[in-house]
Each structure stands twice: as C-alpha cells, then as structure tokens.
Amino acid sequence: KTCEDFMFSLAYYQYIHNFMAINTPVYYYRQNLNSATGKRALQHGLDYQIVFTNISNVFNLQNFPKETTNIFQRRWTRWIIDLISNYKSQNLKSKDIEAAVYSQPYYTAMMHFIPQGILHRIELWLLKKKYSRGIALYCNIMMHFKHLLKRYKL
C-alpha cells in the first residue's frame, strides 16, 4: 500500500492505537487528487472529528510535548481554512460552512491555536467574531494572492 497520504488518511487513523512524532521527513508528501486530502468535501470534515478526538487522546495519554501538539493543531487549522476557501468548488452554502467551522472540536482547536504573524491573527479574529462570510471572503482573497505569488501555504 502507498503511504503517500499516511499522515492524513482516514483509513490509517480510524484504527490508531499509538502515535509517534519525529523531526525528520520520512517521505515526500504530494497531494493525490483521489485521496482524502484531495477531496475537500464537508463529509470529510465531519469524519475527521472522530480522527481528531482519537489523536488528541493519544497526545494526552503519551504526554507529548506542547510543541508537538501545537504542530498538530496548526495543521488541523490550515485544513479547515482550506475547506472554507474551496467552498465554491464544493457547492457549500454559508450555513454548511458555519456548521463545519464552529462544530467541536475544530472551533476549540482554532481558539487554542497560537497566533503567529498577521495572517494568523486575522483568521483568529474572524473566527472569534464568527464572521463566516468574512472568513470565506478573506480566504478567497488569500487564495488568489497565493496563486499570484505561486506559494502553496499562507
């Protein structure tokens, strides 16, 4: 089996009992259009709630350093922001976006996400104020800005 999407694949995470983080790249990750990460649909967001809870429990049981937990929280936050920024291609309505963004545990993760830089502070402020349309507009602007700069991440 391919491990291309190992870190983000539901197939692996559904049965997780243990988790280990290392500070060395094991493989080169690329986004597979047929993978769970390639299909940014609302249903994946709802499915990931189970995954998030399981991994959070593993972090708590194994007493992982705060830095490791923060890395996980940041990755999760970026995924939700990407989900919102791609809402047009998924035909998601504003209420569907709001339901995904403000459902637990995503909202809690984002509220505890440590702001780093102006972009993260803007995102955090929009989330605290619960401006769903503002978040969607902001993400669309950033998505086009990223495209112009040919950058992958915000």
Where are these regions (language model features)?
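Short, charged, amphipathic alpha-helical segments
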Residues: K66-R74, I97-A100
